[in-house]
């Protein structure tokens, strides 16, 4: 993620790497790192609490997320400070992406293991963001299976493909739904990832099939 730091007056790169490849629900937490985007020096820790899920920039704020639905929100343009902590769901949050807001500030979507949550900017005095559950009965196969295409979000659940365009809906698939879910190597589900081919209006999901790892 890129982020402008008004305290240091530089464009930063922010990074987080947790050992989730073998287990999407891993509770192991790792630090969040920062560095100047154009520098060659190694990244250094922001000094904020580690997380197991990941990070997302909802400019000018950094949100970090992980175990037990914990979300921590940085100060405006200051990734080295945490101003608010919220527990927004009961399970680990594994993915976050920015989305269109109401016009009063940034907004984002968070995917936990069993829900989809919207984060909406309120004000500094109210704790920055309000959180509401879009769906409390959802699922996600891989944190890298989520992709945005023209403002609509698509991802793979554990037994069906899903999308969000204001509400969560199942993506109809009468061609290869059973073939995919019967043959994906579930033990390596975190290797599933998505990419888009805008020229042809396509989204592709790549996955380990059969005994492939």
Describe the predicted segments one by one.
Residues 40-47, 80-87, 129-136, 181:
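A short beta-strand motif characteristic of beta-propeller blades
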Residues 5, 22-25, 33-38, 194-198, ...:
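Acidic/polar residues at beta-strand termini and the immediately following turn/coil
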Residues 19, 30-32, 46-119, 207-213:
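N-terminal beta-propeller domains
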Residues 9-12, 61, 92-213:
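Beta-sheet-dominated scaffold domains
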Residues 19-36, 158, 163-168:
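Short, surface-exposed terminal/edge motifs of secreted or surface/virion proteins that either
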Residues 1-11, 15-27:
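Blade-loop segments of beta-propeller domains
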Residues 36-39, 76-78, 121-124, 166-167:
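Short loop/turn segments that connect beta-strands within beta-propeller blades
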């Amino acid at each position: 993620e890129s982020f402008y730091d008004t305290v240091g007056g530089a464009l930063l790169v922010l990074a987080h790497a947790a050992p989730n490849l073998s287990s999407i629900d891993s509770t192991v937490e790792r630090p969040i790192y920062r560095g100047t985007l154009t520098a060659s020096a190694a990244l250094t820790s922001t000094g904020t609490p580690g997380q197991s899920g990941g990070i997302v920039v909802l400019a000018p704020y950094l949100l970090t997320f992980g175990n037990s639905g914990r979300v921590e929100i940085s100060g405006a343009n200051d990734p080295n400070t945490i101003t608010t902590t919220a527990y927004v769901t009961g399970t680990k949050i594994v993915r976050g992406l920015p989305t269109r807001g109401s016009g009063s500030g940034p907004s984002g979507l968070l995917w936990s293991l069993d829900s989809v949550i919207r984060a909406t900017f309120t004000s500094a005095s109210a704790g920055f963001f309000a959180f509401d559950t879009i769906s409390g009965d959802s699922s996600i196969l891989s944190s890298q299976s989520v992709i945005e295409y023209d403002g609509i979000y698509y991802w793979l659940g554990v037994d069906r493909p899903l999308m969000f365009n204001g509400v969560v809906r199942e993506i109809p698939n009468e061609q290869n739904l059973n073939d995919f879910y019967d043959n994906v190597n579930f033990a390596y589900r975190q290797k599933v990832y998505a990419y888009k081919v805008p020229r042809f209006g396509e989204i592709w999901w790549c996955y380990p099939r059969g005994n492939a790892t």
